[in-house]
Amino acid sequence: MPSVVVVGTQWGDEGKGKITDFLSSNAEVIARYQGGDNAGHTIVIDGKKFKLHLIPSGIFFPEKISVIGNGVVVNPKSLIEEIAYLAENGVSANSLRISDRAHVILPYHKKLDFLQEEAKGDKKIGTTIKGIGPAYMDKAARVGIRIADLLDKEIFEERLRTNLEVKNREFVKMYDSEPLEFEEIFEEYYEYGQQLKKYVTDTSVILNDALDAGKRVLFEGAQGVMLDIDQGTYPFVTSSNPVAGGVTIGSGVGPSKISKVVGVCKAYTSRVGDGPFPTELFDEVGHQIREVGHEYGTTTGRPRRVGWFDSVVMRHAKRVSGLTNLSLNSIDVLSGLETVKICVAYERSNGEQITHYPASLKELADCKPIYEELPGWSEDITSCRTLEEIPEAARNYVRRVGELVGVRISTFSVGPGREQTNVLESVWGV
């Protein structure tokens, strides 16, 4: 029962969608296990760019099953729009399966997300205002509405009415904001549920049956380890667990059925929104990396913050997600730089060096990155298909990344296309 988990090892936007799409060719089931439409992944097929937020990358393979697991929070409106977007581009969603246990994002979640973020003033955490956090809050508070509830008119009406009464009191009394209308939400979202009904099932059964039958299953995470609510740069994190351990909770598959964990990273680092970023660049080199790498958020369109590769972050990701393999993306973006740097440790103001990522943001603010400098390369490597074809300086960089992280590099990418992903070692064993 071979199964592979794909996780982002930085702050998201590492190219997980591209790697999932690439690995999907040898998988029979592809499942998303956490997050919501706050995450975006871009896939390039035959030169055409597709941007998805909820539906797994495997949807481009009609013979494979694509699963939205119970750990995902689903905005029905966004999902229906995404299905329509795919249809307009000749891609069918007939192979999609949605967990009946997944929780639903409703208009009051998005409104609350906005109001809470605005109330923080200059202490905003950089939420995408998609309602993700409030939906997970309701789930933990045991007042959430699941897909199974959305499909049952009586249950949906009862729970929506109860929840909206509470939320409207909060909007009016705490935020001096207008209440939401029950009827409008009820009619609109019940109809969304009916449109999605044909895709809804117990996806835990599908996934476990597939694994028990020896089928190859690929699990696709959203965001990245450094945005994990437990292991990330709290409170500048998402509301779920992108780490590999999140698979078992968010898909209904036991940990004994996970074979390999592929960590996806870029040859540099990027981040959207606020929060600590030790290797961030503010100079012309940072600007060049941002422009060459097209570092603008898939969901928000916001310019991403960029910086040098941070092996301290990567070793943290390796430890907390149990990485077995590494997929190194966007090496081509570094072409043209005279020198390239890798952060190998942090130095505190008292001169002490540390090689682990601190939990305390105050402690982290006291740290400066210690860099190892390597020669850069000027050649265009976007057409290279083997490690031997890329310049020696680029080869040395790739090898050094693997050494510092302590994980085998199974693939490296020199561009956004499928054909620009090069295999050093198959994680499927094929």
From Swiss-Prot:
Q: Which residues bind GTP?
A: 12-18, 40-42, 304, 330-332, 413-415
Residues annotated for IMP binding in this entry? D13, E14, G15, K16, N38, A39, G40, H41, T128, R142, Q223, T238, R302
**What is the cofactor note?**
Binds 1 Mg(2+) ion per subunit.
Which residues participate in Mg(2+) binding?
D13, G40
Keyword set for this entry?
A: Cytoplasm, GTP-binding, Ligase, Magnesium, Metal-binding, Nucleotide-binding, Purine biosynthesis
Pathways per UniProt: Purine metabolism; AMP biosynthesis via de novo pathway; AMP from IMP: step 1/2
Q: Where in the cell is it found?
A: Cytoplasm
Pfam families this protein is in?
Answer: Adenylsucc_synt (PF00709)
Q: Does the keyword Lipid metabolism apply?
A: no
Task: Extract the GO molecular function terms from the UniProt entry.
Answer: adenylosuccinate synthase activity; GTP binding; magnesium ion binding
Residues that bind substrate: T298, T299, T300, G301, R302, P303, R304
Q: Record's InterPro entries?
A: Adenylosuccin_syn_GTP-bd, Adenylosuccin_syn_Lys_AS, Adenylosuccinate_synth_dom1, Adenylosuccinate_synth_dom2, Adenylosuccinate_synth_dom3, Adenylosuccinate_synthetase, P-loop_NTPase
Q: Does the entry feature the keyword Magnesium, yes or no?
A: yes
The reactions it catalyses are: IMP + L-aspartate + GTP = N(6)-(1,2-dicarboxyethyl)-AMP + GDP + phosphate + 2 H(+)
Q: What family is reported?
A: Belongs to the adenylosuccinate synthetase family.
> Which NCBIfam families is this protein grouped with?
PRK01117.1, purA
**Annotated function:** Plays an important role in the de novo pathway of purine nucleotide biosynthesis. Catalyzes the first committed step in the biosynthesis of AMP from IMP.
Protein name, entry field = Adenylosuccinate synthetase
UniProt source species: Lactococcus lactis subsp. cremoris (strain MG1363)
Lineage of producing organism: Bacteria, Bacillati, Bacillota, Bacilli, Lactobacillales
Protein's gene: purA
